[in-house]
């Protein structure tokens, strides 16, 4: 601040008539922290404490008998706590498919290297499709493990519900390296071309869009051409819409120009 500004400020203060009561209230208010900051802080602390208490209760429920297991499993489908993993793993062998399925989802929420092999065994051998579907989802959160090839096989051969989640998890499992991305993209491209379920084809498109930055030529061009082909020729509008969104999100000038040409020529609206 300049000398001139200081002088004007001093003169202005000298001419103020200050009400002592008002000044006292203002000074007291200045000692308080921002109420919004206090609310945010309190909410964060409350949520952390609540999660910790929920996890403690969940651990007790998992250990207090079969009648309470599902309640405990619901806790760890929502919260992460490494203490739960040793209690969840034995539940993968339970005779009740709901318990197995819930344990799988909880392990997806609480990924651990020791869970990979038991989950892969379920994906291969469990007779219940809902359990295998849960495994296909959960393995996407265990992408550092050897899950890529089993997910490819599930996308090739399993029921539609499992294929749906296998395609999504392949985007996670294939995103680690260029080689894995290429392997995952190969099966996703095949399934996009031949799978009978529109929702599976749509998920294949989504997964390919997630992987494309990891791919090298000529695979990258193959993916783009497959997306254009789906946009132009797939029988289901939902799949065509997914392909268009994926192509637009690539933000590649040549691809955007190509889409505009299709619009201009009347092939797209």
Write out the residue ranges for each language-model feature.
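Amphipathic alpha-helical scaffolding segments comprising HEAT/armadillo-like alpha-solenoid repeats
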Residues: 48-62, 81-93, 112-125, 144-156, ...
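Compositionally biased amphipathic helical and low-complexity segments enriched in hydrophobic
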Residues: 24, 28, 212, 228, ...
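N-terminal "cap/leader" segments of large eukaryotic alpha-helical scaffolds
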Residues: 2-65, 70
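Short, highly charged low-complexity linear segments
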Residues: 131-135, 162-165, 180, 229-233, ...
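Structural detector for internal amphipathic alpha-helices that build alpha-solenoid repeat scaffolds
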Residues: 28-49, 67-82, 86-93, 101-112, ...
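Generic detector of intrinsically disordered, low-complexity, polar/charged segments
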Residues: 6-9, 55, 105, 137, ...
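Short inter-helical turns and helix N-cap capping residues of alpha-solenoid HEAT/ARM repeat scaffolds
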Residues: 64-65, 95-96, 127-128, 158-159, ...
């Amino acid at each position: 601040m300049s000398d001139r500004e200081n002088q004007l400020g001093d003169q202005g203060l000298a001419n103020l008539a200050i009400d002592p009561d008002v000044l006292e209230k203002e000074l007291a208010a200045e000692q308080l922290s921002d109420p919004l900051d206090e609310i945010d802080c309190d909410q964060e602390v409350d949520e952390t404490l609540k999660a910790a208490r929920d996890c403690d209760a969940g651990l007790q429920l998992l250990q207090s008998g079969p009648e309470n297991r599902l309640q405990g499993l619901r806790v760890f489908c929502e919260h992460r706590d490494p203490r739960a993993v040793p209690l969840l793993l034995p539940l993968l062998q339970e005779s009740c498919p709901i318990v197995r399925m819930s344990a799988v989802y909880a392990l997806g929420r609480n990924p651990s290297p020791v869970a990979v092999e038991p989950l892969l065994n379920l994906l291969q051998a469990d007779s219940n499709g809902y359990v295998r579907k849960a495994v296909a989802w959960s393995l996407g959160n265990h992408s550092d493990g050897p899950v890529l090839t089993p997910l490819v096989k599930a996308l090739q051969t399993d029921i539609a519900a499992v294929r749906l989640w296998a395609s999504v998890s392949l985007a996670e499992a294939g995103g680690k390296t260029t080689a894995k991305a290429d392997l995952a993209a190969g099966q996703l491209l095949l399934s996009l071309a031949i799978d009978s379920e529109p929702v599976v084809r749509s998920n294949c498109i989504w997964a390919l869009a997630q992987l494309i930055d990891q791919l090298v030529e000529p695979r990258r061009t193959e993916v783009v051409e497959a997306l254009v082909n789906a946009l132009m020729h797939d029988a289901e509008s939902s799949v065509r819409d997914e392909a268009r969104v994926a192509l637009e999100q690539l933000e590649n000038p040549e691809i955007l120009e190509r889409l505009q040409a299709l619009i201009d020529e009347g092939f797209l609206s």
